[in-house]
Each structure stands twice: as structure tokens, then as C-alpha cells.
């Protein structure tokens, strides 16, 4: 082979190599398996930077695996703060980009929220996960076609917007819709009406469309995410009692504790004086936190028939979070007792419960 031919072949391989790699057949993975293999948590957004481990938050495995179930068209997650619900969304986005590309419409409550999430969460994920960095060009690259609110990749485009942006919601075809903090969305996208209905209309031409709706709960009677949960399988994260072997949800009403308080500069300061325990709803046995954290747990559906409609819904509070000791939850509750607005925040973000105005 002539030298010029060798050079030409080398240049051709260099030019088409990246494109060929991008069109490799997808791996046979669920979202959880993909995240365990490819996702890295970024140091500026995680206290546990490094490889993602689904075993750290086992309650996220089932919602992630539901995304690759062909019978599931929509996933609803109602969750307290700091349990990893944003990581659920990010893992799904990463999986789509790498394994099952298509147009994604990712919606935050406002455009400001969208820009912030893109800079602080999506950009670091792409930067630190090699398979994503290889497919999504840096916005600083000339002619990359990418901005803070739009990320192109082979086979698709990620559009990041706010529920108050009628133009994006009404004009962007999307196979995938992911809606974050649904209960904080605008009532109407400008004059166009319900933002979720506008977003869903963008999926009309996709036979394989999927939607993910995520939020902390807010006010009883006006919570969009609670309404969506009711239409799904209504699954609760339940732990096995070490005494009777039955499964039960760890909720605040079944948490037992003793405490004292004293006033310092006119303010009540609380102290937990003994172990915090959980009462099994089946046998009544009192089990300490350290034992319950080691017990097997699983999702149990209250409305399993909804699976036939393609909607799986999950509800999770902070008692199962590996980052939130029960004592912290109890103290936050006690400290908020004299302030209804603070108590409302505790109900929504820690207890994972709807607040009922009295």
C-alpha cells in the first residue's frame, strides 16, 4: 500500500471512528445496571463522589428498572428531600443519552431552576461520566450546538426548560418527558394552560414514549403529584419486622421517642433522651433504628392493578435515607411545633407527607 493511501486511510478512520462508536448497539442494561457501570457522582454535588452504587439507595432500584419495562409508560415518584430523587432523574437521562437515545424534555418549575440544575447537576454528570462526555459536546466547543438549556447527542436532544415557558412546552416534540418538583410548577404556562398537559401533547407521535414525574408532596387537596400517585400502583417502601417477619412502612406515626427540653435565651432546645424506635404495625413489637436499617425492604403496591395501565407510582419518606438519622427528623419536628410554616416544611421534606391546612 502506498504511503499516501495509508495516510488517507488513517485520516478516514480518525474521522469516522467517533461516529462509528456512537452507533454501537446498546448494552442490554436496566437504568440501575447502567448507572452502576457508567455513572460517576461529581465532587461538587455529592458527599460520596465516585462510582454510583445502587446498593447505597436500594429503594431507587425498582423505579429505575421500571423505566426499561416496556409495559410501563409513566413513573411517578413522591419523595422527601435528600433521598436521591434527583439522582433517579439524572440516571434516567444518562441512560437515555447512552443507551436508548431520543428527544428529552426535562422540566423544572421555572427557567431559573432549569438553568441552575443544568449547570450544577447535568453538566457535572456529563463531564464525569466517560460514556456521556464522549457523546455530548462541551458548550465551549465551537459549533457544538449545545447550550445551558439544550444538549445534543447522537440520536436525540435534551431540552431543559421551566414550567413557565410556554414556547418550549408547546413546540418541542419529545419522546421522553421528565418533570421535577411537579408541585412547584406554574399553574399555567403563560396563557397556554396546564404545563403537564402541554408537555404530554409533545409525545403524541411517539409509540414508545415515556414520562417521569417527580416531586416532594405539598398541600393536601392541591397536590398534582399526589393525584398522579393515586392513578398508579401506589407503592410504599416497607421493611421486614425482625420479630414477625411481616413488612411495614416506617412512618412518623409509628416512631417512638422520649425527649426533654429547656429554654435558652427564650428558645426551646430539645434533646432526645433514649433510643428512637419503630412499632411494627403487624405485631406491635418495638424495634430500634439500628436494627431496622439492616432489615430487608421492598416496594409493596396498594393498587397493583394499575400496572396494566402502564403507571407505576412510588412514595418515600426520609426515614429510609442513608444520610438522614432518625434523630435529625425527630428534632426537626420538635423544633417546628410552635411554627406552622416550619412544621409544614418538615411534613413535606422529611416526613414525606401532605400538609393539611387547619
Set out the residue ranges of the language-model regions.
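Phosphate/NTP-binding elements of NTP-utilizing enzymes
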Residues: 2-358
Amino acid at each position: 500500500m502506498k504511503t499516501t493511501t495509508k495516510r488517507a486511510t488513517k485520516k478516514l478512520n480518525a474521522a469516522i471512528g467517533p461516529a462509528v462508536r456512537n452507533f454501537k448497539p446498546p448494552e442490554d442494561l436496566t437504568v440501575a445496571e447502567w448507572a452502576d457501570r457508567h455513572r460517576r457522582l461529581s465532587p461538587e454535588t455529592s458527599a460520596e463522589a465516585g462510582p454510583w452504587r445502587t446498593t447505597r439507595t436500594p429503594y431507587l432500584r425498582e423505579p429505575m428498572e421500571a423505566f426499561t419495562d416496556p409495559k410501563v409508560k409513566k413513573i411517578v415518584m413522591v419523595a422527601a428531600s435528600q433521598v436521591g430523587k434527583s439522582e433517579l432523574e439524572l440516571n434516567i437521562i444518562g441512560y437515555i443519552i447512552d443507551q436508548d437515545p431520543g428527544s428529552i424534555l426535562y422540566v423544572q418549575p421555572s427557567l431559573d431552576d432549569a438553568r441552575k440544575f443544568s449547570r450544577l447537576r447535568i453538566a457535572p454528570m456529563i463531564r464525569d461520566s466517560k460514556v456521556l462526555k464522549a457523546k455530548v459536546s462541551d458548550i465551549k466547543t465551537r459549533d457544538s450546538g449545545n447550550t445551558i438549556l439544550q444538549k445534543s447527542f447522537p440520536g436525540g436532544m435534551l431540552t431543559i426548560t421551566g414550567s413557565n415557558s410556554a414556547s418550549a412546552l408547546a413546540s418541542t416534540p419529545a419522546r421522553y418527558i421528565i418533570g421535577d418538583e411537579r408541585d412547584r410548577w406554574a399553574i399555567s404556562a403563560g396563557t397556554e394552560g396546564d404545563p403537564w398537559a402541554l408537555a404530554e401533547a409533545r409525545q403524541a407521535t411517539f409509540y414508545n414514549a415515556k414520562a417521569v414525574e417527580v416531586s416532594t408532596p405539598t398541600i393536601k387537596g392541591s397536590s398534582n403529584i399526589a393525584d398522579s400517585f393515586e392513578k398508579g400502583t401506589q407503592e410504599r417502601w416497607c421493611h421486614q419486622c425482625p420479630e414477625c417477619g411481616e413488612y411495614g412502612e416506617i412512618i412518623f406515626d409509628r416512631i417512638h421517642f422520649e425527649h426533654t427540653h429547656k429554654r435558652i435565651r427564650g428558645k426551646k432546645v430539645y434533646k432526645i433522651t433514649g433510643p428512637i424506635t419503630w412499632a411494627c404495625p403487624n405485631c406491635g413489637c418495638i424495634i430500634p433504628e439500628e436494627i431496622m436499617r439492616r432489615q430487608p425492604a421492598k416496594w409493596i403496591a396498594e393498587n397493583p392493578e394499575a400496572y396494566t395501565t402502564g403507571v407505576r407510582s412510588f412514595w418515600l419518606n426520609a426515614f429510609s435515607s442513608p444520610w438522614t438519622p432518625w434523630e435529625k427528623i425527630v428534632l426537626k419536628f420538635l423544633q417546628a411545633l410552635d411554627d406552622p410554616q416550619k412544621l409544614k416544611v418538615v411534613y413535606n421534606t422529611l416526613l414525606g407527607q401532605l400538609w393539611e391546612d387547619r
